[in-house]
């Protein structure tokens, strides 16, 4: 019996020692010396002390981060408490602070070592230490949020304030020293000894591997299958989503309270609409039972890959102390003060004023607003270097609005076809149900290439890696969040399957099969047909749209079905295989599965808008043959040049028409000559624009 207790104490000691070693390695490898100094000052200047242990509680954390909480100076910011995310964030950090020993140490007291691990994990700096660890935090984040199927979290956190102090090795009041471990979350207690290790947390394995401590992981961190049985309550996820949406534009060292306080009722209503839309994507059963790991993992990995990005600038606040004065003179050995070395100021450096992401000057949007933009930033990437829209300082330029420019394809082509950069198409309209009730819906598409009638793309071998910023995306953001990611092999599709297609006869088609135009094709044979995981068709009057979503694959196509991400498919030739589930979307254009269930929405268009994407100045460069950067010409300047060219061509056509003669037959002959030359008519958009 004594031997067993000794072995248990040794194992506990090993776990504590390894946890501290990992925190030390994170501190030295993932932070600069200056950042670590600021982190220490922020932590210890606010820390509470008990039995010689310095730690933070929920109120201190919420107050420092500026997160609305149920108590303290960061108390409820909204009357309904939807932004009271303090308890949610504190639960997360109490779990993450125990990494990689969540089974036996979580929830942990938020000591300085625990805070180091929290900041590293939530700002994704762990890649500097965990070289072989996959940058995939989904399981870790799920475990930190799961609160259904666990022992009462509030009671457990209170117990942890005492039990974990003793587990660190502090002598108890009755004498002696003990390593009485906190029991950990109930769902995290190790069971299922004989299970495969394929489901082990990749980050935890990499952390233990970096410390040469895999055996400790196998003994003390056996994979716990009950983590897949626990769930996140709807209230917890709703509060987190609300916080993430309102703080999505937060920049490093930005003021959090700017986004979490003073929100108008209309702004909060819009936030709640987007939160409800995301929750609706999980299904109706979530409201009763909570969010399971499978649903959570699929939602994040396939349609919200950048959802947790706002946590990075939020926790980077810990790496700058407003109290720290590094310019103080230091005394030398002879008592003389040295000249102060140039050091960073004790207040955040003033950066040049940033223009808003949504640029003004073209039209007042009826669809796009800061809340919608936050939602879009969770799944649209505009740069392979810095995916997040707010982090890479992308700007959105107003290109076309049906309200401002009219419901005309001529106007659409004038504004959109001349925009030589990626665009985001947004449509707001109504879907009429069977009982004649109208449901407002908002759909859209991300088009990474310039629009043109005859689609041609730069050649790319299918074996080359792709980034989401280079792939198109079809989506619905209200009333049910739905994202159809672009297929990694879309550039190798046939020429009759472009990402976007424009025709004055049939309208606008996105992700459709375009029938060949011939004299024999009549009527419906000329209309584009849905393909792949989904398609969007807009009539030539810009009055009606058809949004088609397939549960399977309507043959090969531009878009994957919902619930499938480009990284979750393997590309071989023209076939795409879905790896996450047993439902394979492998199909060819000639063998469309009749069992595929298509959902078709017929939408009466209220507003249609196109927004042009302008990358930041630092990202809008490319290298020449010598490696020197070459500035790309601004998309706005290119469009204006195209408009000037079209104006000159219009004047030239008018002069030619006048020379042809005033007779009707002569005018028709002149027009025919101009059409044959490609100067007027539909064919003018087939050629590449002149510069």
Swiss-Prot record:
Annotated region described as Disordered, given as residue ranges: 329-355, 559-595
Regions of compositional bias (Pro residues) in chain numbering: 341-355
UniProt entry tagged with the keyword Lipoprotein: no
Cell compartment(s), UniProt: Cytoplasm
PROSITE patterns with a match to the protein in the record: TLDC (PS51886)
Keywords: Cytoplasm
Domain TLDc: 366-614
An example Gene Ontology CC term for this record: cytoplasm
Matching InterPro entries: TLDc_dom
Location (main, coarse): cytoplasm
Biased composition range(s): Low complexity: 561-595
Purpose: May be involved in a process influencing telomere capping.
Protein family according to the UniProt entry: Belongs to the RTC5 family.
Protein name: Restriction of telomere capping protein 5
């Amino acid at each position: 019996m004594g031997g067993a207790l000794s072995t248990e104490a040794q194992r506990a000691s090993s776990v504590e020692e390894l946890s501290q070693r990992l925190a030390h390695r994170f501190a030295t490898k993932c932070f600069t010396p200056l950042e670590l100094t600021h982190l220490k000052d922020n932590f210890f200047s606010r820390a509470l002390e008990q039995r010689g242990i310095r730690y933070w509680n929920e109120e201190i954390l919420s107050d420092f981060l500026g997160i609305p909480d149920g108590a303290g100076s960061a108390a409820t910011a909204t009357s309904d408490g939807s932004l009271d995310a303090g308890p949610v964030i504190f639960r997360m950090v109490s779990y993450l602070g125990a990494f990689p020993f969540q089974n036996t140490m979580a929830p942990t007291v938020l000591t300085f070592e625990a805070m180091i691990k929290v900041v590293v994990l939530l700002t994704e700096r762990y890649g500097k230490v965990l070289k072989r660890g996959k940058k995939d935090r989904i399981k870790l984040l799920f475990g930190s949020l799961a609160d259904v199927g666990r022992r009462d979290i509030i009671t457990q956190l209170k117990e942890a304030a005492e039990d974990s102090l003793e587990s660190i090795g502090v002598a108890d009041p009755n004498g002696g020293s003990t390593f009485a471990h906190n029991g950990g979350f109930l769902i995290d207690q190790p069971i299922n000894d004989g299970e495969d290790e394929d489901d082990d947390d990749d980050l935890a394995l990499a952390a233990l591997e970096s410390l040469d401590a895999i055996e400790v992981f196998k003994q003390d961190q056996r994979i716990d299958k009950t983590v897949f049985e626990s769930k996140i309550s709807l209230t917890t996820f709703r509060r987190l989503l609300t916080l993430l949406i309102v703080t999505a534009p937060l920049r490093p060292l930005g003021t959090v309270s700017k986004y979490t306080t003073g929100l108008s009722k209309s702004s909060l209503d819009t936030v709640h609409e987007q939160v409800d839309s995301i929750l609706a994507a999980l299904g109706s059963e979530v409201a009763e039972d909570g969010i399971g790991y499978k649903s959570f993992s699929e939602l994040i990995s396939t349609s919200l890959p950048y959802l947790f990005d706002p946590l990075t600038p939020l926790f980077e606040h810990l790496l700058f102390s407003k109290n720290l004065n590094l310019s103080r003179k230091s005394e030398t050995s002879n008592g003389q003060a040295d000249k102060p070395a140039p050091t960073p100021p004790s207040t955040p450096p003033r950066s040049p004023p940033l223009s808003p992401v949504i640029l003004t000057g073209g039209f007042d949007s009826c669809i796009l607003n800061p809340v919608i933009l936050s939602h879009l930033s969770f799944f649209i990437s505009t740069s392979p270097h810095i995916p997040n829209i707010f982090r890479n300082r992308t700007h959105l330029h107003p290109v076309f609005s049906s309200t401002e420019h009219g419901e005309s394809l001529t106007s659409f082509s004038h504004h959109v076809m001349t925009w030589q950069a990626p665009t985001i198409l947004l449509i707001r309209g109504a879907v009429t149900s069977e009982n004649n009730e109208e449901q407002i819906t908002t759909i859209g598409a991300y088009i990474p290439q310039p629009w043109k009638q005859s689609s041609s793309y730069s050649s790319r071998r299918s074996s080359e890696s792709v980034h989401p910023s280079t792939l198109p995306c079809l989506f619905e953001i209200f009333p049910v969040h739905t994202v159809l990611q672009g297929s990694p092999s879309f550039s190798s599709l046939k020429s009759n399957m472009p990402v976007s297609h424009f025709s004055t006869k049939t309208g606008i088609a996105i992700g459709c099969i375009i029938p060949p135009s011939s004299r024999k094709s009549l009527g419906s044979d000329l209309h584009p047909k849905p393909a792949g995981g989904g398609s969007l068709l807009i009539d030539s009057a810009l009055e009606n749209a058809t949004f088609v979503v397939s549960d399977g694959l309507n043959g090969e196509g531009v878009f994957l079905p919902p619930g499938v991400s480009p990284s979750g498919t393997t590309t071989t030739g023209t076939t795409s295989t879905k790896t996450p589930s047993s439902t394979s979307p492998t199909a060819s254009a000639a063998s469309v599965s009749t069992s595929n269930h298509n959902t078709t929405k017929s939408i009466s268009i209220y507003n249609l808008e196109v927004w042009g994407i302008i990358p930041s100045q630092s990202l809008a460069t490319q290298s020449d043959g010598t490696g020197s950067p070459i500035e790309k010409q601004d998309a706005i300047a290119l469009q204006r040049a195209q408009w000037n060219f079209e104006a000159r061509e219009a004047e030239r056509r008018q002069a030619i028409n006048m020379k042809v003669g005033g007779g009707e037959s002569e005018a028709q002959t002149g027009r025919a000559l101009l059409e044959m030359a490609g100067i007027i008519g539909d064919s003018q958009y087939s050629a590449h624009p002149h510069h």
